[in-house]
Amino acid sequence: RKLLLIKTGHADRTTNKRLGYWRKAPRLDPAIARLLSELGHRVSFVPEHLPWQGTYARNLQRLGVEVIHAPSVQNAQSFILENGSDYDLFFLSRATTGGRILPALKATYPEKPIVFDTVDLHFLRLLRAAELTGDTKDFQEAETVKRTELAAIHQASATMLVSEHERAYLTDEIGPFPHVLLPLILAPHTDRTGYEERLDIAFVGGYRHPPNIDAVRYLVQDIWPQLRALKLGARLHIIGSHMPADFQDYAAEDIHVVGFVQDLDTYLSSIRVSVAPLRYGAGVKGKVGNSLRLGTPVVATPVAAEGMSLTDGEHLLVANSPSQFAQALYRLYTDRPLWERLSSAGQSRVETLY
């Protein structure tokens, strides 16, 4: 069968720069494309933004994927609607892209199956952001995206979700619907650097994603001063691409504003504790899964740990206030038996699940 993958982003956008490390761990196009190709399907990929600049598109082509790009194609939606008859199935991603295109695609090719990949529930993430800010405009945006996202789910032949949590949430909202669960796709990593060989604390994120910006501000302004007061002596590493300019103002003797890291596996394998203080979001968190994969224990908010089938105190530590975070970070950083237990159990858990 010939499949058309339609996704937000650019034909040249590397996953390194997308989220600060070498792949968008949960649902990277190459991972999905590779699985589809191994099943014998011919895959074409249409990014929302068409300019070609190299690395990412070439990586897809090495997997046998046809990449549609400029200058041969100037408008992604026009190409899709005009050439849809050449394909047996459409795979659309994200409410902001796939959700917008899906109604026209369904009207033009009503007989063709469409799979809608939420990536995360966008409206849920925006609703949680609105609850944090209390801004009427944020609530209105969340409601607009909710209508688009739920309409796409209703019209799709099947919806792809990342977690049982979001499946249950949607079922409560709209009742039963055709769906499939595809969680994180993580490469195995059996090696684990020991406690003594590691130092410091790190946050990893891509800063085109607003929850990560908010998390860093919360970490630096509210959590880190309390950890300083405990005289832990660790340094905070803020990692990831597309940082706001004012992040440089956070640089201090005990705060290293790193930016983009090419080889995150090596970097995180030298870090003693990973922190995920997300105050809002949805889906499953690649930063949590990737850290645990490397044997780097995590302190996370309930939102950051949500939907990942991880247990507080067994696979990671969960904290929900600045004081809880400071205490959990101090405890995990200094308590070697606890660190070793969570490092081993967390790595084993994600190896089993993802």
Task: List each model region and its residues.
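N-terminal subdomain of nucleotide-sugar transferases
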Residues: 1-58
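Conserved catalytic-core segment of nucleotide-activated headgroup transferases in glycan assembly
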Residues: 17-35, 44-45, 154-160, 164, ...
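Acidic donor-binding loop of glycosyltransferase active sites
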Residues: 86-89, 157, 266-283, 294-297
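Acceptor-binding helix/loop patch of EC 2.4 sugar-transfer enzymes
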Residues: 111-112, 116-144, 168, 206
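Short hydrophobic beta-strand element within catalytic cores of glycosyltransferases
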Residues: 287-291, 297-301, 317
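Short acidic/histidine- and often glycine-rich active-site loop of Leloir-type glycosyltransferases
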Residues: 302-313, 317-318
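Conserved acidic donor-binding segment of nucleotide-sugar-dependent glycosyltransferases
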Residues: 316-323, 331-336
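A charged, aromatic-enriched C-terminal amphipathic alpha-helix characteristic of glycosyltransferases
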Residues: 334-354
